[in-house]
């Protein structure tokens, strides 16, 4: 109960001291929130930013959301009565879809997810042609990032079209059979072009290639010494063109499948597909607090993303100059605000931002000091 009351009071302090970051056309968005007591409340609507900020000051949310969709009547309870007018294209990237994340620390998770965000941004900008102004990037306040595409090109897309985009980014249909068929078109951009270059790079290094063959590699490598159309097969595999896909043998297919798995590990982006396909999705409100960490949902300039550290930039100013006592059941280590904390089980005095993180993540509890 102490942790509940303190968290509520500190979140209330935050909302009294800070402004939310308003999405466009806020009057057309459905608003929802989870209070500190009770279940989610949704189908709310506000005419402008003053109304919603007044609301959150009176009703402190643990989590605050808004719809990626635009509606004529956003406060209607039944979806068909809201009258859908379009939706942003949303991508959610967090630890839930990262292999091995259950064995990572919080900081390791953030770094790993960041790699996938960079891959996603590369797809959106270089493959789909969205400009920087059309892409809104936010640290979620939790274990990842949200990417919003705000463009006339996406508003009217239905769930199936959004699923195709998601599959492209996750390389769901990127199989050797499909690659061989698509190579006839000789694409000049996209994953197939990159995969073709990747194959050429690997076949140009015998020791590197050896990693991708299961069996007698010397025998396989000798098979590449034969001539095809006046050229050695190994030379064709090394060339940066699509001719290689016309001459692959079964043994080559085994190698290419192994290379493809490695390629996907390095270049696909692990997104939460149901979020992308949902044209009515509620997403975290920019500038709100994440109820499990006390960190803010923070906008990130995509040109400065490489240097962005959420454990500095997403820490609210109002939590930086206060301290609290927390009790931990086990030792815990984390670096926040460029300070490394090595906490022992038992009572610890820590900065308020860390106390809210520890209690929100159920790592510790507030202690009432008299």
From Swiss-Prot:
A Pfam family:
DNA_primase_S
A GO CC term? primosome complex
The question of whether Metal-binding is a record keyword is answered with yes
Top-rank EC class of the record's enzyme: transferase
Q: Which residues form the active site?
A: 92, 94, 272
Among the GO biological process terms of this entry, one is: DNA replication, synthesis of primer
Q: What is its EC number?
A: 2.7.7.-
Database matches in SUPFAM superfamilies: Prim-pol domain
**Molecular function via GO:** DNA-directed RNA polymerase activity; metal ion binding
Cofactor(s) the protein needs: Mg(2+); Mn(2+)
Q: Which UniProt keywords apply?
A: DNA replication, DNA-directed RNA polymerase, Magnesium, Manganese, Metal-binding, Nucleotidyltransferase, Primosome, Transcription, Transferase
- Which domain of life, per UniProt? Archaea
Question: Hey, which family's this protein in?
Answer: Belongs to the eukaryotic-type primase small subunit family.
Task: State the protein's purpose.
Answer: Catalytic subunit of DNA primase, an RNA polymerase that catalyzes the synthesis of short RNA molecules used as primers for DNA polymerase during DNA replication. The small subunit contains the primase catalytic core and has DNA synthesis activity on its own. Binding to the large subunit stabilizes and modulates the activity, increasing the rate of DNA synthesis while decreasing the length of the DNA fragments, and conferring RNA synthesis capability. The DNA polymerase activity may enable DNA primase to also catalyze primer extension after primer synthesis. May also play a role in DNA repair.
State whether it acts alone or in a complex, and with which partners, per the record: Heterodimer of a small subunit (PriS) and a large subunit (PriL).
Recorded hits in PANTHER family, A to Z, give: DNA PRIMASE SMALL SUBUNIT
The record's annotation in NCBIfam families points to:
primase_sml (TIGR00335), PRK00419.1-3 (NF001641)
Q: What is this protein called?
A: DNA primase small subunit PriS
Q: Which organism is it from?
A: Picrophilus torridus (strain ATCC 700027 / DSM 9790 / JCM 10055 / NBRC 100828 / KAW 2/3)
